[in-house]
C-alpha cells in the first residue's frame, strides 16, 4: 500500500512526530557523518572489547564530587566518614580510586584504570617542591581547622616594628649649687678667668651682688680670687654671673669654694685674720704713705711690696674714697 493511502483528504502532509522520526540524522548533530564510519568503529570496538562486558557508566555522588571542588580546603558538613577522613587537594584526590558503591565495576573498566594510571604518573612525576608545598599546605589546614580566615595571610615576622623613640639630648646649664643652710651665714665663692690687671674691674662688678667682707687674690699672675660674702643669698647672685662678659673684654666664671679650701680660709681667718674693709675716713692722706698690704701672696700673709704700675684713679666720691682706702690706690 502506498504512502498516499494513509493520507487523509483534510491533511495533505505528515504529522510533525512522523517527520521527526523519519528525518535522517544530520552530520552536525551525529557523531558519525556516514554509515561506513559507524560500521568501522563498531567493528573496531567488537575486536578490542568483544570478549568483555561493556563498562557501566560512572556513578558519582555529591560526596565524591566535593573532592573536585576548588573549595575543598573549606570544611564540609557531609555525613560520610570516608570523605571527612581523607581531605586532599583536587590534584591529589583525582589520582586515587574514587570510593563509590560501584567500585568493583569501575576497577574492571579498562578506560578508568588507564586514566588512573596516567594521573598517578603525573602526580609522581611532579617536582619535589610542588609536592612539599602541597603537603605543607594540607598539614597547615589540618592543624588550623576552623581558625580565623586571615591566619597564614598576615605573618608576624613580616610586620615592621618601629624602634622606641629616643630621648632628645638637651644641653643643660650646669648651675653651681651651694649647700643649703642658714641664708645669713657667710659664704665663699671663687671667681676665675681674668688677668691680674682686671682684678679691680672684676671686684667692682661682683660687689653689686652684695656686701663683700673679704677677698683673697691668688698667687702672682693668677687669674682667680676668693670672695667672702656676708650671706648666702648674695653668694647665689654671684654664682648666677658665671659666664658673664664684663665691659665686653672679660668673661669670668664663678664656682663655690671647695670644702678643703673653705676650711683653710676659715682657719687663716680665725688665726691670723685678714684686713677688713676699713670705713671711709678723712685721714686718707696719712694712710697713703704706708705700704700697701698684700693678702696671702705665695702663702705669706701681709708681705709688703712697693706699688707697681699706675692704677686707674676713679672719680672723687665716697665710693672712690672707700676703694682708695681698701686697695691703697
UniProtKB/Swiss-Prot annotation:
<dbReference type="InterPro" id="IPR017389">
    <property type="entry name" value="Nucleoporin_NUP53"/>
</dbReference>
<feature type="domain" description="RRM Nup35-type">
    <location>
        <begin position="183"/>
        <end position="264"/>
    </location>
</feature>
<keyword id="KW-0509">mRNA transport</keyword>
<dbReference type="GO" id="GO:0017056">
    <property type="term" value="F:structural constituent of nuclear pore"/>
</dbReference>
<keyword id="KW-0906">Nuclear pore complex</keyword>
<dbReference type="GO" id="GO:0005643">
    <property type="term" value="C:nuclear pore"/>
</dbReference>
<keyword id="KW-0653">Protein transport</keyword>
<comment type="similarity">
    <text>Belongs to the Nup35 family.</text>
</comment>
<protein>
    <recommendedName>
        <fullName>Nuclear pore complex protein NUP35</fullName>
    </recommendedName>
</protein>
<comment type="subunit">
    <text>Part of the nuclear pore complex (NPC). The NPC has an eight-fold symmetrical structure comprising a central transport channel and two rings, the cytoplasmic and nuclear rings, to which eight filaments are attached. The cytoplasmic filaments have loose ends, while the nuclear filaments are joined in a distal ring, forming a nuclear basket. NPCs are highly dynamic in configuration and composition, and can be devided in 3 subcomplexes, the NUP62 subcomplex, the NUP107-160 subcomplex and the NUP93 subcomplex, containing approximately 30 different nucleoporin proteins.</text>
</comment>
<feature type="compositionally biased region" description="Polar residues">
    <location>
        <begin position="123"/>
        <end position="139"/>
    </location>
</feature>
<keyword id="KW-0811">Translocation</keyword>
<feature type="compositionally biased region" description="Polar residues">
    <location>
        <begin position="282"/>
        <end position="306"/>
    </location>
</feature>
<keyword id="KW-0539">Nucleus</keyword>
<dbReference type="Pfam" id="PF05172">
    <property type="entry name" value="RRM_Nup35"/>
</dbReference>
<dbReference type="GO" id="GO:0015031">
    <property type="term" value="P:protein transport"/>
</dbReference>
<dbReference type="InterPro" id="IPR007846">
    <property type="entry name" value="RRM_NUP35_dom"/>
</dbReference>
<dbReference type="GO" id="GO:0031965">
    <property type="term" value="C:nuclear membrane"/>
</dbReference>
<dbReference type="InterPro" id="IPR012677">
    <property type="entry name" value="Nucleotide-bd_a/b_plait_sf"/>
</dbReference>
<feature type="region of interest" description="Disordered">
    <location>
        <begin position="48"/>
        <end position="105"/>
    </location>
</feature>
<dbReference type="GO" id="GO:0003676">
    <property type="term" value="F:nucleic acid binding"/>
</dbReference>
<feature type="region of interest" description="Disordered">
    <location>
        <begin position="123"/>
        <end position="167"/>
    </location>
</feature>
<keyword id="KW-0813">Transport</keyword>
<dbReference type="GO" id="GO:0051028">
    <property type="term" value="P:mRNA transport"/>
</dbReference>
<dbReference type="InterPro" id="IPR035979">
    <property type="entry name" value="RBD_domain_sf"/>
</dbReference>
<feature type="region of interest" description="Disordered">
    <location>
        <begin position="271"/>
        <end position="315"/>
    </location>
</feature>
Amino acid at each position: 500500500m502506498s504512502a498516499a493511502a494513509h493520507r487523509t483528504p483534510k491533511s495533505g502532509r505528515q504529522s510533525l512526530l512522523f517527520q521527526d522520526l523519519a528525518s535522517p540524522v544530520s552530520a552536525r548533530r551525529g557523531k558519525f557523518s556516514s554509515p561506513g564510519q559507524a560500521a568501522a568503529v563498531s567493528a573496531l570496538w567488537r575486536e578490542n572489547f568483544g570478549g568483555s562486558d561493556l563498562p557501566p557508566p560512572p556513578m558519582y555522588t555529591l560526596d565524591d564530587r566535593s573532592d573536585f571542588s576548588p573549595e575543598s580546603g573549606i570544611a564540609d558538613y557531609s555525613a560520610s566518614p570516608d570523605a571527612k577522613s581523607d581531605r586532599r587537594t583536587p590534584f591529589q584526590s583525582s589520582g586515587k580510586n574514587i570510593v563509590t558503591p560501584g567500585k568493583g565495576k569501575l576497577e574492571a573498566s579498562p578506560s578508568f584504570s588507564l586514566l588512573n594510571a596516567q594521573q598517578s604518573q603525573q602526580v609522581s612525576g611532579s617536582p619535589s617542591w610542588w609536592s612539599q608545598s602541597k603537603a605543607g599546605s594540607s598539614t597547615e589546614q589540618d592543624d588550623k581547622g576552623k581558625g580565623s580566615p586571615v591566619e597564614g595571610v598576615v605573618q608576624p615576622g613580616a610586620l615592621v616594628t618601629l624602634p622606641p623613640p629616643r630621648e632628645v639630648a638637651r644641653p643643660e646649664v650646669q648651675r653651681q649649687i651651694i649647700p643649703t643652710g642658714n641664708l645669713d651665714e657667710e659664704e665663699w665663692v671663687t671667681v676665675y678667668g681674668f688677668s691680674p690687671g682686671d682684678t679691680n674691674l672684676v671686684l667692682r662688678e661682683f660687689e653689686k651682688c652684695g656686701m663683700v667682707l673679704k677677698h683673697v687674690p691668688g698667687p702672682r699672675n693668677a687669674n682667680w680670687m676668693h670672695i667672702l660674702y656676708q650671706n648666702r643669698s648674695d653668694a647665689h647672685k654671684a654664682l648666677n654671673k658665671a659666664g658673664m662678659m664684663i665691659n665686653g673684654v672679660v668673661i669670668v666664671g664663678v664656682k663655690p669654694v671647695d670644702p678643703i679650701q673653705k676650711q683653710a680660709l676659715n682657719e687663716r681667718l680665725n688665726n691670723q685674720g685678714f684686713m677688713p674693709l676699713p670705713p671711709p675716713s678723712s685721714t686718707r692722706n696719712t694712710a697713703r704713705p704706708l705700704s700697701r698690704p698684700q693678702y696671702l701672696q705665695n702663702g705669706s700673709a701681709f708681705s709688703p711690696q712697693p706699688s707697681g704700675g699706675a692704677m686707674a684713679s676713679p672719680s672723687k666720691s665716697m665710693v672712690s674714697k672707700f676703694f682708695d682706702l681698701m686697695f691703697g690706690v
